[in-house]
Regions:
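Metal-dependent catalytic core segments for phosphate chemistry
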Residues: 169-206, 288-293
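Polymerase palm active-site segment centered on the conserved acidic dipeptide of motif C
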Residues: 19-43, 252-268, 346-385
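A structural signal for short secondary-structure junctions
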Residues: 153-155, 326-327, 332-336, 363-366
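A structural signal for short, well-ordered beta-strand segments
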Residues: 165, 337-339, 371-373
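Conserved catalytic core of nucleic-acid polymerases
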Residues: 54-57, 122, 205-328, 333-334, ...
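Conserved "right-hand" nucleotidyltransferase catalytic core of DNA-directed polymerases
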Residues: 1-143, 152-159, 166-169, 202, ...
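Short hydrophobic/aromatic beta-strand micro-patches
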Residues: 340-344
Length: 385
C-alpha cells in the first residue's frame, strides 16, 4: 500500500486549503476585534472566559488552566450565550486550522506526481492498531468528507471501493460479555437490517417509535463507547452534551437491560488487578493470545485494550484474506476499521462482493463481525456525503 500510494485531487486540495486559511484569518480578526485576544493563545482564551464568568476546571500537564477541547465543549453546553459563541468559534477555528495544515498543506507540498505515499506502522499503538503518518490519516475526523474528497481512484478507468467494519468493537464487547439480550439484539438487527443502537434505544427508553435520527441514540452510543474507553458518566455526559444526571439515568437503564457488559467489564478489571498484585503487571490476552499490559495505575484501560486490540487483529486478519483473494494491488490505505481500494470500473460490483466476503468474520464470535461495502465512488469522500 505504501508503494501504491493514493492519487490526490490537487486542484480541490489547493482550493480547500485557501478556503480554510481564509476562514481562520477571519476568525482571528473577529477575536482580535471583539476581545483583543489571539484566538490561538491558551492563556488569553482562559482570561477572556474568566472575564465572562466561566470557571475553568481543565488543567494542562503543568497545572495551568486550559482552554482544552473538553473545556470548550463544557462551556458550549453550560455557558452564557456569549461564552458559548466564543467556545464554538474556537473549536471551529482549531478544526479548520488542523485540516488546512495537517492535511491539505501536506498534500500540496509532499505529493509525488499527484500521489501521496503514507507510512503505515502496523503496530502503531499499544493495542496493535495501525498508525498512518505523512499524512496522519488515522486522525481524520470520523465520518467527515472534507479531506477524504481529495482521494481519487488511480486513473479514470478505476473507481473507489471502501469497506468498514460494522460497530466491530461493540460487537466484540457483546460477544465476550455473553449477555444474552445483547447477543439476541445483534442477531435480530442483522436479520432485519435495523440499526443496533436504535434497537437498544427502543428497549432502554421503552419507545418503539424511536428512529435512527433520534438524538437519544447518541446517548446510547455514549454509554457503550464510554464503557469501552474507560470513561465515567461525567465524561460521557460531556461528550454527548447533556447533563450528568440525564446520562446517569440512561446508563442505569442500559445496565438493567444488559447487565452482562458491566459484569464483564468488572471481571476484566478484577483479573487485571489480581495479576498486578501477583505478578507485578496487569494485562489481558486478546483472542489470538497476544498479551497487552497496562500501566500500574490504569487497570481500568484493560477492557479497552482487550476489545480494541482484538478488533485490530480482526482487521489485519481481513487484510490477509484480501491478499489471499489477489486484491493486494488494489489496496490504497487502511484507516481505523476501514480499507480503501481501487477497482477497475467494469469489475466494481464483482470486487465489492469479494471484499464483503473477506471483511466479514463469523467464526468464533457469538455476534458476527460484519462489514459495510460502499462503491463504486469517484472519490473517497463521496461515501460520507
Amino acid at each position: 500500500m505504501e508503494l501504491n500510494g493514493a492519487r490526490l485531487d490537487l486542484d480541490y486540495s489547493k482550493k480547500k486549503y485557501q478556503e480554510l486559511i481564509d476562514y481562520t484569518d477571519q476568525v482571528a480578526q473577529w477575536a482580535k476585534g471583539n476581545y483583543g485576544l489571539s484566538i490561538g493563545s491558551n492563556q488569553q482564551l482562559v482570561r477572556q472566559f474568566e472575564a465572562l464568568n466561566v470557571e475553568i476546571t481543565e488543567l494542562t500537564d503543568k497545572g495551568q488552566k486550559s482552554a482544552s477541547k473538553d473545556q470548550l465543549k463544557l462551556i458550549s453546553r453550560d455557558g452564557s450565550a456569549e461564552a458559548k459563541q466564543l467556545a464554538d468559534t474556537t473549536l471551529k477555528y482549531r478544526q479548520a486550522l488542523k485540516l488546512a495544515n495537517t492535511y491539505f498543506a501536506n498534500f500540496i507540498n509532499d505529493n509525488t506526481d499527484g500521489f501521496v505515499h503514507p507510512s503505515i506502522n502496523t503496530m502503531g499503538a499499544r493495542t496493535g492498531r495501525m498508525s498512518i503518518q505523512n499524512p496522519a490519516l488515522q486522525t481524520l475526523p470520523k465520518g467527515d468528507d472534507t479531506v477524504r474528497r481529495a482521494f481519487l481512484p488511480k486513473d479514470d478507468d478505476h473507481v473507489i471501493i471502501t469497506s468498514d467494519l460494522d460497530q466491530v468493537e461493540f460487537r466484540m464487547f457483546a460477544s465476550l460479555s455473553q449477555d444474552p439480550n445483547l447477543i439476541q439484539l445483534f442477531l435480530r438487527s442483522d436479520a432485519t437490517g435495523s440499526d443496533p443502537f436504535t434497537e437498544i434505544g427502543r428497549e432502554v427508553y421503552q419507545d418503539q417509535s424511536m428512529v435512527k435520527s433520534d438524538k437519544r441514540r447518541n446517548l446510547i452510543k455514549g454509554v457503550v463507547y464510554g464503557r469501552l474507553y474507560g470513561a465515567g458518566v461525567s465524561k460521557q455526559a460531556l461528550t454527548a452534551g447533556v447533563p450528568e444526571e440525564q446520562m446517569r439515568a440512561v446508563s442505569n437503564a442500559f445496565d438493567e437491560r444488559y447487565p452482562g457488559m458491566q459484569r464483564f467489564q468488572k471481571y476484566v478489571e478484577q483479573t487485571g488487578s489480581t495479576r498486578l498484585e501477583a505478578e507485578g503487571q496487569g494485562y489481558v490476552h486478546t483472542w489470538t493470545g497476544r498479551r497487552i499490559p497496562c500501566d500500574e495505575d490504569r487497570v481500568y484501560t484493560l477492557v479497552n485494550y482487550l476489545i480494541q486490540g482484538g478488533a485490530a487483529e480482526v482487521f489485519k486478519s481481513n487484510l490477509v484474506k484480501l491478499d489471499q483473494a489477489d486484491l493486494t494491488d488494489l489496496l490504497i490505505v487502511p484507516v481505523h476499521d476501514e480499507i480503501v481500494l481501487n477497482a477497475p470500473r467494469e469489475d466494481a460490483e464483482e470486487i465489492k462482493q469479494l471484499v464483503r466476503k473477506c471483511m466479514t468474520t463469523t467464526d468464533n464470535w457469538s455476534v458476527p463481525l460484519t462489514a459495510d461495502v460502499d462503491g463504486p465512488l469517484e472519490n473517497w469522500g463521496a461515501k460520507y456525503v
